[in-house]
Regions:
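TPR/TPR-like alpha-solenoid repeats
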Residues: 63, 86, 101, 122, ...
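Structural signature of tandem alpha-helical TPR/SEL1-like repeats
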Residues: 34-43, 71-82, 109-118, 145-154, ...
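Terminal, low-structured helical/coil segments at or just beyond the last alpha-helical repeat
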Residues: 209, 213-274
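Short helix-capping/linker turns of helical repeat alpha-solenoids
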Residues: 50-53, 67-70, 88-91, 104-106, ...
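N-terminal leader/linker segments that initiate helical-solenoid repeat arrays
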Residues: 19-51, 55-62
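Hydrophobic face of amphipathic alpha-helices that form TPR/SEL1-like repeat modules
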Residues: 28-31, 59-68, 97-104, 133-140, ...
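Hydrophobic h-region of N-terminal signal peptides that target proteins for export
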Residues: 12-20
Length: 274
């Protein structure tokens, strides 16, 4: 007979097992990647991947295709197989990775239509990177008929939720009159919104640090720790791109237009809650 005490005991045991399993996954997979123990990470992540852990499967896929240097040989087939297993479990990050693989054409042959399918699966669950991916397909007509209005709508959907790359997309759309009437003030505002996330000096310091890390990498051993920083790299790329395009845009605008753009950026920041 189930009593309140029995239920509490069952709950604590189940919760404790869950926490223990998560800690094991952290130390037995993710921490090994973080400390750049690439071969050990593959072995450790494989244990959890074989247990059906979709995050482990995705990380294992990244390890097989993203590890570089040393005597490591990439295995694109294994990478695709593990990531597709996670994607079929409805793991959003894996679905996004499937889209990027089909779009990039390195791990598997390029197939923009399949990329669109996987972007849509992840976008349906609100993944902002996937929404941005769809926007790029429509903007450039990759795998779909070029549709600037649809691209703009998708950029806007993610931009209003503070997705940096989509905010850059908004700025470029207004600048180039793609899917919306040309408006340099609004273009300036959106690009400024992204650029202002980090001061120029701080951004340059981060750039310098990453460049030094890359130059000082020991290429005699496998390198894999950076695969945990993919999202961070994407945001830094968006920041750098926004700063560069904003500087170029300033040269086309007068002082009054620039001031209007700055004021609008403040308004947008308040509306978005940035």
């Amino acid at each position: 007979m189930l009593t309140p005490r029995n239920l509490m005991t069952f709950f604590l045991m189940t919760f404790g097992m869950s926490i223990h399993a998560e800690l094991d996954f952290q130390s037995g997979c993710k921490d090994l990647i973080k400390s750049n123990q690439c071969i050990a990470a593959i072995e450790g992540c494989t244990v959890f991947a074989n247990q059906g852990n979709p995050e482990a499967q995705t990380l294992l896929g990244f390890l097989y295709s993203g590890t570089r240097y040393g005597d490591f040989r990439k295995n694109y087939k294994q990478s695709f197989n593990w990531i597709s297993m996670a994607a079929e479990q409805d793991y959003t990050k894996a679905q996004l990775a499937m889209a990027e693989m089909y779009k990039g054409g390195e791990v598997v042959p390029e197939n923009a239509r399949k990329a669109k399918v996987w972007y849509e699966k992840a976008a349906e669950k609100g993944n902002l990177d996937a929404i941005n991916g769809l926007a790029r397909l429509y903007r450039y007509g990759v795998g779909v008929r070029k549709d600037h209005e649809q691209a703009f709508a998708l950029y806007q959907q993610a931009a209003l939720k503070n997705h940096l790359a989509s905010q850059v997309g908004m700025g470029l759309s207004y600048r180039d009159a793609k899917g919306v009437k040309k408006n340099l003030v609004k273009a300036y505002a959106w690009l400024s919104l992204v650029s202002d996330n980090m001061e120029d000096r701080a951004f340059k310091n981060i750039q310098k640090r990453y460049e030094q890390e890359r130059e000082n990498q020991d290429k005699t051993i496998p390198q894999c720790k950076f695969i945990l920083k993919y999202d961070e790299f994407d945001d830094l790329f968006a920041l750098g791109y926004a700063k560069r395009e904003l500087l170029s845009l300033k040269q086309r605008m007068g002082l009054k237009q620039t001031k209007k753009g700055k004021d609008l950026a403040v308004q947008l920041r308040q509306e978005i809650g940035q």
